[in-house]
A protein has these predicted regions:
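Short, Gly/Pro- and small/polar-rich lid/capping loops
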Residues: 1-37
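Generic structural signal of hydrophobic/aromatic residues within well-ordered alpha-helices
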Residues: 10, 18, 59-63, 75
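N-terminal cationic leader/targeting segments used for protein routing and processing
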Residues: 18-21, 26, 42, 46, ...
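N-terminal non-catalytic cap/leader segment that marks the start of a structured domain
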Residues: 40, 44-59
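Conserved beta-strand/loop scaffold segments within soluble protein domains that form the structured core
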Residues: 51, 62-190, 195-196
Length: 198
C-alpha cells in the first residue's frame, strides 16, 4: 500500500485582502493518510489521453492551484497516477470524469486538461461518494488554455457531508483564451430525485 501521512496540512493560503472580504484565509487538515488513487471512470470524445503527462512541455505541472503547494506535495508523495487529456479540435465534445469515493477511503486524484490554439472542450467532473462517508478525498485539476481556446469545467459535488473533500483547481490562459468554471453543489440538488445524465 502506498501512503503518505500529512499532519496539519494547511490549504488555501489566501492573502489579507481576501481575509477582509471572506473572513477566512486558510484551513488546516489534520493527520491525513492518503493511501490510494481514487476510483475514476472516464468517458472521452475526440480527446487524446497523454500517458507521460508532458503537456505543453511540462508547463501544466507548474500551475499552482488555490489550495497551495502542500496539496501538490501530498499528491506527489502519494505517487498517485495522474491522468492528462489534450485536444486541438474546436468543439471537441467532452471529457466526463466520474470519481467514486467509498465510505472511509483516503483518496487523491490528479487531472490535467490542455487545449491547443483555437480548440474548445467541455469537462464534466462528478464527485460522488457514500452519503454516510467519513473519509478524505482530494482532486487536483490543472488547466492550460492555449491562445483563443476555451475550457469549460463543470463540477458536480455529491460526496457525503462528513467527508473531508479538497477540490484544488489551477489554470493558465494564453492571449484570448478563457476557462469557465461551473460548480454545482449537492445541496442545490434534490438528491433522492436527481440522476447524473450529463
Amino acid at each position: 500500500m502506498i501512503g503518505i501521512e500529512e499532519k496539519d496540512m494547511i490549504i488555501n493560503r489566501i492573502p489579507a485582502k481576501t481575509w477582509n472580504h471572506l473572513h477566512m484565509n486558510q484551513s488546516r487538515v489534520g493527520e491525513v493518510v492518503i493511501n490510494r488513487t481514487g476510483e475514476l471512470n472516464a468517458s472521452v470524445n475526440d480527446v487524446s489521453l497523454i500517458d507521460d503527462g508532458k503537456l505543453n512541455n511540462g508547463e501544466l505541472n507548474n500551475i499552482i492551484g488555490g489550495c497551495g503547494q502542500e496539496i501538490t506535495e501530498a499528491a506527489r508523495k502519494s505517487q498517485t497516477e495522474p491522468v492528462y487529456y489534450i485536444t486541438d479540435k474546436k468543439n471537441a465534445g467532452f471529457v466526463r470524469l466520474d470519481f467514486n469515493y467509498g465510505r472511509n477511503n483516503a483518496d487523491i486524484n490528479v487531472v490535467g486538461i490542455e487545449t491547443k490554439e483555437n480548440a474548445s472542450i467541455d469537462v464534466y467532473m462528478d464527485f460522488n461518494g457514500d452519503k454516510d462517508g467519513e473519509g478524505f478525498a482530494a482532486v487536483q485539476t490543472r488547466l492550460y488554455a492555449a491562445k483563443d481556446s476555451v475550457i469549460r469545467l463543470i463540477q458536480i459535488q455529491r460526496v457525503g457531508s462528513e467527508t473531508t473533500f479538497i477540490n484544488d483547481i489551477g489554470g493558465y490562459c494564453e492571449d484570448g483564451a478563457r476557462i469557465e468554471l461551473v460548480p454545482v453543489s449537492y445541496t442545490h440538488l434534490r438528491a433522492h430525485e436527481t440522476r447524473s445524465n450529463l
